[in-house]
Amino acid sequence: MKIKNWSHVGIVVDDLEMMTDFYVNTIGLERLHESDARPQLDGDHTGVPNVHRTLRFVGIPGDHEIELIYFIDPPATDGHVDVHKFGSTHICWDVEDLASVYEELKDKMKFVTEPKWRTRPDGSTVGLIYGQDPEGNWLEFTQRP
């Protein structure tokens, strides 16, 4: 098997409009495309019978995308996992200036800490911060050499 390319990460959301607003107007991604997803005649790949969803993609055109998945029927239920538990996930973006990203976003989202800097074995440093979107999904921003 050979992986050809990255495609997207999917996040199940409770409030599609709020989450779209956050990722577009706070994080700075673009709204790319959307579909009204209903099962095909041959069934549905999700394993949820007769599922009806709205799939909205945000991201950087020509690059990685985030699929915001809103379950219309049956509605989704809370399934958040603490950051230190199996099954926990996060999305990470590389940024040019971690300190300015933190200053710009600190009043718009919840961060766990201020930016932290780590020295790598080769002597270079990497900065990172962890935070959460409005529905509690984990986000990371890193500044690499």
Which residues fall in each region the model found?
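Core segments of cupin and vicinal oxygen chelate
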Residues: 12-63, 100, 124, 130
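Short, conserved beta-strand edge motifs with alternating hydrophobic and charged residues
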Residues: 34, 68-69
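Glycosyltransferase donor-binding loop in the core domain
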Residues: 10-11, 93
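Histidine-centered active-site/metal-ligand motif
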Residues: 8, 52, 90
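Vicinal oxygen chelate
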Residues: 16-17, 60-64, 70-138
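Short beta->alpha transition motifs characteristic of CBS
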Residues: 141-145
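Extreme N-terminal starter segment of soluble prokaryotic enzymes
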Residues: 2-7
